[in-house]
């Protein structure tokens, strides 16, 4: 039996905050792997600004050097909204001997009551919550919390900084920054 942490998100772009969360949860919970699952269209957000191909390429570059980090693009292959319930149902069907843990930030903890089929989902997985500045970790739902170093970092902030040609070194893996430059993503590198 393998124990797998699931880190879902748009990863637009993937940044060091994502990697820090993944590694700290993996270590604290002694998980075998962390699977990064980019969403197609999350129910709580509008469409992403960057294509799925670019996002998966950037994730792969970001996680390449870590033997316990894997990319799983199953949600990108589905049409429409990406619901966690559908993803976990598919994963448990494909990997019945695995135990899955779904990693969420403090920003998502407070929305658990609104999640699609939350009661059924709670029977299938364990949620692992990590703190995020400005959000409460208080919930009546069963969530295992992992205390990790927090940084005020989001993909939204990084996209804005890239568009404004502001300094972002040390916030993105170098390989991802190189990819952003080469493909002129987020307005970076355009005249």
UniProtKB/Swiss-Prot annotation:
Statement: the UniProt record of this protein carries the keyword NAD: yes
MF annotations from Gene Ontology: ATP binding; nicotinate-nucleotide adenylyltransferase activity
Record flagged with keyword Secreted: no
Keywords, sorted A to Z: ATP-binding, NAD, Nucleotide-binding, Nucleotidyltransferase, Pyridine nucleotide biosynthesis, Transferase
Catalytic activity: nicotinate beta-D-ribonucleotide + ATP + H(+) = deamido-NAD(+) + diphosphate
Pfam families: CTP_transf_like
Pathway connected to this protein: Cofactor biosynthesis; NAD(+) biosynthesis; deamido-NAD(+) from nicotinate D-ribonucleotide: step 1/1
GO biological process: NAD biosynthetic process
EC id: 2.7.7.18
InterPro entries referenced in this protein's UniProt entry, alphabetically: Cyt_trans-like, NadD/NMNAT, Rossmann-like_a/b/a_fold
Top-rank taxon: Bacteria
Entry similarity comment: Belongs to the NadD family.
Chain's role: Catalyzes the reversible adenylation of nicotinate mononucleotide (NaMN) to nicotinic acid adenine dinucleotide (NaAD).
The protein's name in its UniProt record: Probable nicotinate-nucleotide adenylyltransferase
Organism taxonomic ancestry: Bacteria, Bacillati, Bacillota, Bacilli, Bacillales
Gene name, Swiss-Prot/TrEMBL: nadD
């Amino acid at each position: 039996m393998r124990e797998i942490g699931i880190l879902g998100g748009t990863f637009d772009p993937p940044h060091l905050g994502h990697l820090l969360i993944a590694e700290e949860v993996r270590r604290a919970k002694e998980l075998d792997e962390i699977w990064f699952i980019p969403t197609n269209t999350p129910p709580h957000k509008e469409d992403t600004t960057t294509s799925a191909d670019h996002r998966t390429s950037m994730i792969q570059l970001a996680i390449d050097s870590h033997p316990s980090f894997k990319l799983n693009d199953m949600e990108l292959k589905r049409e429409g909204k990406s619901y966690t319930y559908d993803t976990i149902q598919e994963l448990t069907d494909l990997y019945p001997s695995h135990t899955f843990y779904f990693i969420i930030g403090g920003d998502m903890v407070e929305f658990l009551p609104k999640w699609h089929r939350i009661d059924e989902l709670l029977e299938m997985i364990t949620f692992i919550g990590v703190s995020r500045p400005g959000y409460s970790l208080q919930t009546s739902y069963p969530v295992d919390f992992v205390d990790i170093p927090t940084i005020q970092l989001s993909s939204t902030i990084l996209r804005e900084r890239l568009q404004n040609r502001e300094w972002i070194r040390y916030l993105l893996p170098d390989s991802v920054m190189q990819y952003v430059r080469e493909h002129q993503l987020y307005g970076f590198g355009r005249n």
